[in-house]
């Protein structure tokens, strides 16, 4: 029984270590999502301008009913 617990702890620690080692580079990171609003869902241009103001390339309304302004970098 003690061996099973040791194996379980070992597997959990290995999973945590492998998860921490898989941090993406900055160029591989996902789009920046900002809080709701900034024109979404009815004025996508306001979202785009907001993203440009925070030095992103642009933005669009995303989500289930386009309520979240999502900025893209490249």
Curated annotation (Swiss-Prot):
Q: Which residues form the signal peptide?
A: 1-21
- Report where it is expressed, by tissue: Expressed in the hemocytes, fat body and ovaries.
GO cellular component terms?
Answer: extracellular region
Keyword terms, alphabetized: Antibiotic, Antimicrobial, Cleavage on pair of basic residues, Defensin, Disulfide bond, Immunity, Innate immunity, Secreted, Signal
Q: Subcellular localization, per the record?
A: Secreted
Q: SUPFAM superfamilies this protein is in?
A: Scorpion toxin-like
Propeptide positions in the record are 22-34
Q: Write down what this protein is called.
A: Defensin
